[in-house]
Amino acid sequence: MALKHDWTKEEILEIYNKPFMELLYDAATIHREHHDPNTVQVSTLLSIKTGGCPEDCGYCPQAARYHTDLEGNDLMSVNQVKAQALRAKASGSSRVCMGAAWRNVKDGEEFDNVLEMVRSINKLDMEVCCTLGMLTENQAQRLAEAGLYAYNHNLDSSEEYYKEVISTRGYQDRLDTIGNVRKTNVTVCSGGIIGMGESEADRAGMLVALSTLNPQPESVPINALVPVEGTPMEEQEPVPIWEMIRMVATTRIVMPETQVRLSAGRTQMSREGQAMCFFAGANSIFAGDKLLTTPNPDVSEDMEMFKMLGLNPQKAFEKKSQPESVAAEKSKYQSQGEKPRWSRPEHKIDRNLEAQQNAKTKA
């Protein structure tokens, strides 16, 4: 059966709102047609540069304009990252995703160091993913040459609700970055967050945006908002587990071949709830004691859960072969001293402005 790239919001809403047991059955059936239901990818998310981001994302404690008591750190060294990757591999992870709190990639020493990090992790026979903000086609090509397996750039929500969350960067800017990644052999990881105050129609809208990409993203992380004090969304109520399961199941039906990743918010989910998500089609998790800045179950807890459920960690490069890594001196693509161009909507989001004012008061 050919993948469908013309899903409408109405079609996706109809799936999302099916009777719960029917939705689970449909999703589980499709999941088994495309994936081993007993195999789950384990990925470790590593914050290589924390805090100080100039964006105003309403959910994010790394935004410099909000007061969140976050302890920032400069870019980690290549050796520090390699040591963390070795630790992750020993714990059962097959992928390392490096996150830097940047609006965009800038050519120069720091990006050169990130490229070396990619090379060093690739040599450990692990899948390497990065989430570094916006990037140009040339920068994407250089990451691909270094041996990058995946690039993460989330859409966050529907295009309509996105405007209630972020004013410093447009939705199309995110799609443009995904487009630049698609011009290389790097796979795309892109998903979003539920629980930010969006409607079911917004959740469907996000899945429309993702599923109509051709090809569809190889990975789609589904995050449940973790409210952080000091951010504009600090008072949002936790997402009910039933909504998370519905979102996972709908994503699986709409994008059958994609790896659906249970991401932020797992500390709020029982093992029973997570098991239902796996049954509904989730086949990837982020492991480690925190995801960038938010709490996450300990790896040993996850391995215990896997044992209980009869799940096996996915081996590296099961979905796609290991990328070749080219040494810096042999690189076909050189620094052009460029940075991405992006729109600056700069419309007013009241709760973001209020949190920003509160931060000034506390300072």
From Swiss-Prot:
Binds 1 [4Fe-4S] cluster. The cluster is coordinated with 3 cysteines and an exchangeable S-adenosyl-L-methionine. GO terms for molecular function: 2 iron, 2 sulfur cluster binding; 4 iron, 4 sulfur cluster binding; biotin synthase activity; iron ion binding. CDD domains: Radical_SAM. Residues 354-363 have a biased composition (Polar residues). Pathway: Cofactor biosynthesis; biotin biosynthesis; biotin from 7,8-diaminononanoate: step 2/2. [4Fe-4S] cluster binds at C53, C57, C60. It catalyses: (4R,5S)-dethiobiotin + (sulfur carrier)-SH + 2 reduced [2Fe-2S]-[ferredoxin] + 2 S-adenosyl-L-methionine = (sulfur carrier)-H + biotin + 2 5'-deoxyadenosine + 2 L-methionine + 2 oxidized [2Fe-2S]-[ferredoxin]. Catalyzes the conversion of dethiobiotin (DTB) to biotin by the insertion of a sulfur atom into dethiobiotin via a radical-based mechanism. Homodimer. This is Biotin synthase. It comes from Christiangramia forsetii (strain DSM 17595 / CGMCC 1.15422 / KT0803). The gene is bioB.
